[in-house]
């Protein structure tokens, strides 16, 4: 990136703005500036006041799991024809798999900051949307709006990521877009996707995106109040033609309406759908055993799953095979059927995240994925040394409790204290 900048300017970098805490928006900082430059004040790094909390909270608590799930989402473990001519839905495929660098911000932004950097007047807005600490940058003198990921580029917004995240509030997202619409930008610059030129075009893209988000939210809530469950909601809530056909910005390349609907339900109500049968269900393996027996036994269900593949019904084939795998996780005939079903679903999917999850899971089922190696590799991506060193000692120690094997310590009653001589 710096090499490309140097083709058009040799001016020094005096400031960096972290748009939000996601790794694709802050990893690699040491390729641009050094920690010594920041410490000396030669370079300023701006970020929202909650960025460090969000970054540490994610890395310290769920870093290992989120690293693996990110690998599935972005297709880091796929090779050859599986990724040939593919992108990430919001831009080129990330290189992935290597620990990034990080420098803690030196300047914090709350709701709004007006600042002049190197003679350029900037206004920085807090615009919670795809991330709770999202910042957008407005250059009033040139009418340029860097909206970061409030607008994710040419795709329906990823209102919930399959990687896993806390609730992304669609109401706040809409409010953030409306705030940016009020600036009447002539140039709209997302951090994913192509820039939008012209005030009318910028307004149209922002308006249609916020309308898409609000429509999905409002209709989901409307039908929730009628008593519909998530499985029922995804069959009912769909974008109307004037939004669904707004290509490419509301095409479901990266986010999908279905996963947005499910996260809205869980965000408002949690996991319980109102049927007490779900309060203490029969364990999955036992339920599978009973259902397979009712359906005629293992061989019969395997035959039905295989026939479903032949009949171009890969989803049903995968669901049938799943019952057999829950009974015996090493049932390779069932695993191969489910893997083939996932390949068919993956290659047919327009959404890149769904595609990558299907194809990567097919490798897992077939035994061609080195889960332990890849988990370790991706954990280092989500928890690189630069971030680990920024985790406060108290937070780090607190996170250790989630690693405790409680079954091995039920008879232990002791206290453990740590004293850090090198901390204030």
In which residue ranges do the predicted regions lie?
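Active-site metal-binding motif and surrounding structural segment of the metallo-beta-lactamase
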Residues: 2-45, 108
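Active-site neighborhood of phospho(di)ester-bond hydrolases with catalytic His/Asp-centered motifs
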Residues: 13-22, 46-48, 145-148, 187-192
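Divalent metal-coordination and catalytic microenvironments
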Residues: 5, 20, 45, 109, ...
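Hard-cation-handling environments
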Residues: 202-203, 207-208, 216-334, 340-341, ...
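Pre-active-site segment of Zn-dependent metallo-hydrolases
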Residues: 1-16, 58-62, 66-68, 312-314, ...
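Feature captures hydrophobic
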Residues: 286-287, 300, 304-319, 323-330, ...
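Metallo-beta-lactamase
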Residues: 1, 53-226
